[in-house]
A protein has these predicted regions:
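Exposed loop/turn and edge beta-strand positions of beta-sandwich/beta-sheet ligand-binding modules
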Residues: 42, 73, 89
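Short beta-strand and beta-hairpin "edge-sheet" elements
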Residues: 79-80
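Buried, small/hydrophobic-residue-enriched core segments of structured protein domains
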Residues: 69, 83-448
Length: 448
């Protein structure tokens, strides 16, 4: 019987433009790009040059500090450009795709015949090891770590997030194979929604399955780790996106690196919200072309709370499960501002009268609606943070640079995304996710 854990802290933000369960196909796409910044914590070293021909699965760059960690091209084709920014930082590696795709053959494997070292070696060789993250530090993991557990959250609850039950349809065999492969390395814990009707997810082999019920961010893998396997200093837990599990399963079953994923195209400024199959590194222009309303819009590579601001010139992120388009809001003109009833506006603390109209989908824009101010100790964070940590005190310790206090308050167990809802409700308008990222990076440097 599946264990059920119910959380009560959090906030569900209902936004207009949720993707309907309709999947469309992209037209012909010729240009792709892999972005090193998608793999937090690595130092990229490019191993190809312009004009080189690569197969799908060949490395485009490696982690300079761990050269055995490769990052594979999503397509076969000609390396078109290595785009660099300030101080020669690698921004992306562009590949012009062949008309007919060729894959590097790593050979299909019987997962039952592999041990943990065999799985590690295969993932390193094929360029999929970098898709595994770790706690502490919420970074792409390294081969010198030994996890005490591996966590996979097989559902999503961020605003406008896609339904993983729908995304995984037809790929259940690959998902199970990926879970079995990871179980060769450490105990695998899979979180699913209590509402999930997918029998494969509910009856997974080689994993401990836990059903979760509660408001956002109950789906965050950091919440699962905090409840089931707290991370102490010196310990490591791996976290794997459910789509990366499918990538691993495909590699074992076919011998190919196939980075195709089903993403939600959502938001109030999307004409027809839907799902689409796209490779990692697909141009956002190809995904959104002809499906965005006119006017000033914010294109987000990811969900509205944790995604990054992007443009039509951007590329689908390595861990991105949705592309969102919402109003920018810079052309809004509201008479009398906050003093108006604002029946069409969302408020977490019922500052507006919209709550009288019952549950509904809101059309929110990208405005912060307020300036930065001193941190207010109001208990707001704790109301939406379903973890056994003192969120406000942890943020204060990060701002103060007090590493000892950060360790005592549980920084090893958190990722920036765990503070996404707290950032949304924060009266101080602080960029909490950026602060947590800064604190984790500082702590990592201190402990290296």
């Amino acid at each position: 019987m599946i264990n059920l854990i119910e959380t009560h802290k959090g906030l569900d933000i209902q936004l207009a433009g949720k993707a309907s369960e309709k999947k469309t196909k992209l037209g012909v796409v010729s240009d792709y790009a892999l972005v090193p910044d998608d793999f937090t914590g690595i130092v990229p070293k490019v191993v190809v040059k312009e004009g080189d021909h690569v197969l799908a699965g060949d490395p485009l760059f490696v982690n300079k500090n761990f050269p055995e960690v490769r990052f594979a091209s999503p397509v076969s084709g000609i390396v078109e450009a290595v785009v660099r920014g300030d101080r020669r930082k690698v921004l992306c590696v562009k590949v012009k795709a062949d008309d007919s795709q060729e894959y590097r053959d790593f050979g299909s494997k019987n997962v039952d015949s592999l041990d943990g070292n065999g799985v590690r070696s295969l993932l390193l060789e094929a360029g999929l090891f970098g898709y595994i993250n770790q706690l502490p530090y919420a970074v792409s993991t390294t081969p010198d770590t030994t996890p005490k557990a591996i966590f996979v959250s097989a559902f999503r609850d961020m605003p406008l997030a896609g339904d993983f039950d729908f995304e995984v349809k037809g790929q259940e065999v690959d998902f199970q194979t990926g879970i079995t492969a990871l179980s060769k390395i450490a105990q695998v814990n899979v979180g699913i929604s209590s509402k999930s009707q997918n029998e494969t997810l509910r009856n997974l082999k080689d994993a401990t399955v836990t059903a979760w019920q509660g408001p956002c961010p109950a789906a965050n893998v950091g919440v699962h780790v905090n409840h089931l396997c707290p991370v102490n200093k010196g310990e490591v837990v791996w976290t794997v996106d459910p789509v990366a599990v499918i990538f691993i399963g495909r590699l074992l079953n076919t011998g190919k690196v196939d980075l195709r994923r089903t993403i939600a195209v959502a938001g109030s400024e999307v004409v027809e919200p839907h799902y689409v199959d796209a490779l990692v590194g697909t141009p956002l222009k190809a995904i959104l072309e002809g499906n965005v309303r006119e006017g000033a819009v914010r294109i987000i590579n990811g969900n509205p709370l944790t995604g990054r601001k992007d443009s039509l010139d951007g590329y689908l992120g390595a861990h991105t499960s949705e592309v969102t388009v919402i109003p920018e809001g810079d052309d809004a003109d509201e008479m009398l501002g906050w003093i108006m009833p604002r029946l069409g506006h969302f408020s977490a603390n019922r500052s507006y009268f919209s709550w009288l109209l019952g549950k509904r989908d809101y059309k929110l824009d990208a405005r912060v609606k307020g300036g930065k101010r001193n941190m207010i100790m109001s208990g707001e964070y704790d109301k939406v943070l379903p973890m056994d940590i003192y969120g406000e005190y942890l943020i204060k310790a990060i701002i103060a640079g007090d590493i000892d206090k950060q360790e005592q308050l549980g920084i090893y167990e958190v990722a920036p995304e765990d503070f996404a809802v707290a950032e949304f409700v924060d009266s101080s308008k602080l960029e909490l996710q950026s602060l947590v990222r800064k604190g984790l990076d500082t702590l990592r440097k201190e402990n290296m």
